């Protein structure tokens, strides 16, 4: 039977499969911020794992990598009192949605995110959680010897407190007492989906990974919606251009971020004036610097401290009708034993029941 005849037979017997395969080939499904289709994901993950195993055979186990979370509980009465005091005065001069109370809602994401690190990244030396004088209710039942709460006052100059601006908080991560030179920055809505080795983030020679996206900052601006993250990234590019011959147009994948304390210190020495200029912004504005998620990773790259690496991850906005489809897809992959993605990142502003179901899919 010729190839054409086989296709015709498939069309007659299984038209739904025929059109599914035809459309998948013509319009490959993409779940990530990288130029790879869904059919390529498992092979890429397997290739990364094999390379990491070769490196592991020739190096000692790394024991000096920390994890840092930032977290806020918007339902805390003490925090709400501070928010109510400052939000009305800053609403007009802050960036789009910067004072929206939904940005600070807690759906217990941190519980699952921290436990995922403990389960799938047991080599992590210590976990630091930065809060505004808050404590997760579940912390006493968790491995406290490996987790330390860091209050904003411990790392941020008092003249800038209170702050509700994540960009400001992220500018002081290097001030965490006893923080390792190499650390990984997490938001609390990032969930590890399977075991990850230290080499995915840092090589034994100290070189960090930088997870670049195929997205374009220029295209984002041309769409007309200027977010504080976009503005802060563009500001960071202008600062980098003072020292390096760059043509940066790629944001990083919306993921965990390997960082170096020494590169934070370098940024503060070089750009102190610009940094001090945005720290008074109590809510995010279009004049901020995107420190942890852009400036420092790119600075590490141009200083020869980081190299590009692939990170297969899914970004969920569970307000989207497509979210349930993605959830079922990952659950099916887990059930049939297929390689899972590195992690999933979600926007969690809907019913808590759905949130919990989705998170459990990845962790347990």
Curated annotation (Swiss-Prot):
GO molecular-function term, one example from the UniProt record: transferase activity, transferring phosphorus-containing groups
InterPro entries reported for this sequence: Stealth, Stealth_CR1, Stealth_CR2
EC number(s) recorded for this UniProt protein: 2.7.-.-
Keyword terms: Exopolysaccharide synthesis, Transferase
Single GO biological process annotation from the record: polysaccharide biosynthetic process
Pfam families: Stealth_CR1, Stealth_CR2
Function in brief: Part of a capsular polysaccharide synthesis locus.
Further remarks about this protein from its record: Stealth proteins are part of a protein family that is conserved from bacteria to higher eukaryotes. Family members were first identified in microbes as proteins that help pathogens to elude the host innate immune system. Microbial stealth proteins are involved in the biosynthesis of exopolysaccharides. Stealth proteins are predicted to function as hexose-1-phosphoryltransferases.
Family statement drawn from the similarity comment of this UniProt entry: Belongs to the stealth family.
UniProt protein name: Capsular polysaccharide phosphotransferase cps1A
Lineage: Bacteria, Pseudomonadati, Pseudomonadota, Gammaproteobacteria, Pasteurellales
């Amino acid at each position: 039977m010729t190839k054409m005849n086989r296709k015709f037979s498939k069309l007659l017997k299984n038209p739904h499969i025929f059109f599914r395969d035809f459309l998948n080939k013509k319009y490959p499904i993409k779940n990530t911020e990288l130029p790879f289709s869904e059919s390529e994901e498992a092979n890429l993950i397997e290739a990364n794992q094999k390379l990491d195993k070769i490196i592991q055979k020739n190096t000692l186990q790394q024991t000096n990598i920390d994890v840092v979370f930032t977290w806020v509980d918007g339902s805390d009465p003490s925090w709400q009192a501070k928010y109510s005091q400052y939000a009305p005065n800053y609403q007009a001069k802050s960036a789009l949605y910067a004072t929206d109370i939904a940005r600070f809602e807690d759906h217990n994401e941190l519980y699952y995110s921290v436990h995922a690190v403990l389960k799938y990244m047991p080599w992590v030396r210590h976990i630091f959680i930065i809060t505004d004088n808050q404590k997760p209710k579940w912390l006493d039942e968790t491995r406290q010897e490996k987790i330390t709460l860091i209050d904003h006052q411990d790392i941020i100059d008092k003249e800038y407190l209170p702050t509700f601006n994540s960009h400001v908080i992220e500018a002081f991560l290097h001030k965490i007492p006893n923080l390792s030179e190499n650390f990984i920055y997490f938001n609390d809505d990032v969930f590890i989906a399977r075991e990850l080795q230290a080499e995915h983030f840092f090589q034994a020679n100290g070189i960090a990974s930088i997870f670049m996206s195929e997205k374009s900052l220029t295209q984002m601006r041309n769409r007309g919606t200027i977010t504080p993250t976009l503005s802060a990234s563009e500001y960071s590019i202008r600062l980098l251009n003072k020292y390096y011959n760059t043509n940066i147009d790629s944001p990083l994948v919306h993921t965990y971020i390997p960082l170096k304390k020494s590169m934070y210190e370098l940024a503060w020495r070089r750009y102190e004036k610009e940094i001090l200029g945005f720290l008074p912004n109590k809510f995010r504005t279009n004049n901020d610097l995107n420190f942890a998620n852009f400036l420092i990773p790119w600075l590490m790259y141009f200083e020869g401290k980081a190299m590009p690496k692939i990170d297969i991850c899914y970004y969920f906005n569970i307000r989207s009708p497509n979210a349930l489809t993605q959830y079922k897809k990952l659950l099916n992959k887990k059930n049939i034993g297929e390689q899972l993605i590195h992690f999933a990142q979600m926007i969690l502003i809907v019913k808590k029941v759905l949130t919990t179901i989705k998170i459990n899919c990845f962790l347990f």
